[in-house]
């Protein structure tokens, strides 16, 4: 029964991630068609959107992966990180209005994939962010002061990831406590019939 509940939860997370993937693509497409948007390589951006859409369609709707797993969700979020990084790189680096899309991945990962995967994804996002920040300055002007400014700008991402991970862990512990309480007899502490179904 617990496996069915876990699979049902993963299916719900997967549906949410599918909506997130399509909304992300629509948002990037809307930014792309805005007359005031700044895109360095328009063909590269169009190609990235087409490849990302093909990935989502093939990964989600080809029925190759019928059973939902956390690693499937993690792989999809890594693809989202690469897509966001490419879009941010093409639209102004760390000054891009699309930079905050990383928060969606951090929050989703923290709520659904656990602390370790969230830490790995946050490390990947951090590397992308600092690469984008470093590539936006001249070689001789990069200094400790500039590194401090980048770190302070990026600190809210760390806080969001950390606090969301803590909240998700607390919710998971509370749910497990409620399951244990509902599966045991209040007076004797032994498992009741519901625990064996």
Predicted regions span which residues?
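Membrane-helix interface "capping/anchor" motifs
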Residues: 65-70, 110-121
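N-terminal membrane insertion elements
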Residues: 17, 114-166
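Short, Lys/Arg-rich, polar N-terminal cytosolic tail immediately upstream
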Residues: 1-10
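Juxtamembrane or sensor-core-proximal signal-transducing alpha helices
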Residues: 58-62, 152-182
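Residue-level signature of transmembrane alpha-helical entry/exit and packing/kink sites
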Residues: 73-77, 99, 145, 149-153
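Hydrophobic transmembrane alpha-helices and their membrane-interface boundaries in multi-pass
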Residues: 16-93, 101-106, 125-127
